[in-house]
Amino acid sequence: VEHLIKKGKKRIAHFRGPLLPQNSIDRFLGYRQALEENRIEYDKDLVFICDEINDSEGYDHMQQILDQKMDVDAVFAVADLPAVGAIKCLIENKVHIPEEVAVMGFSNWLISSLITPSLSTIDQPGELIGRKAFQVFLDESDAKKRKEPVVFKKYEIETTLIERKST
């Protein structure tokens, strides 16, 4: 969201995931925080829920934005698939990307580099996350076998902005 704001975008829609998974909550809170830190008013009407987190939801939400003339200049999607759907809708409606509406995804799936225009996204190191999660599982299993308390550990893993043509 910071990247979109640095590009001059101020009316940023958010295609968020379902209300419960923590990653969906965290990305929504990050969206809110970036708006607040940049003194951009939060508009609940610019937040759309993607229950399935797929391209058709991104397409449908983007079409709704265009039909209702919501004056959006960017979209931040919870994952790459809804962002891909938004791009498809914008292209079919002859909206220029990123000049009129920029689109940003999250996850850096292969499709993000294959579509036209290519999708700017946030890369998260999935293999490293998987290895850390497995190590936590092993540590907790060992602690339980030894009848020791399980110690809560917090890991922060860096993500990387991948800037492509959609922003």
Where are these regions (language model features)?
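Bacterial carbohydrate/catabolite-sensing allosteric modules
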Residues: 1-167
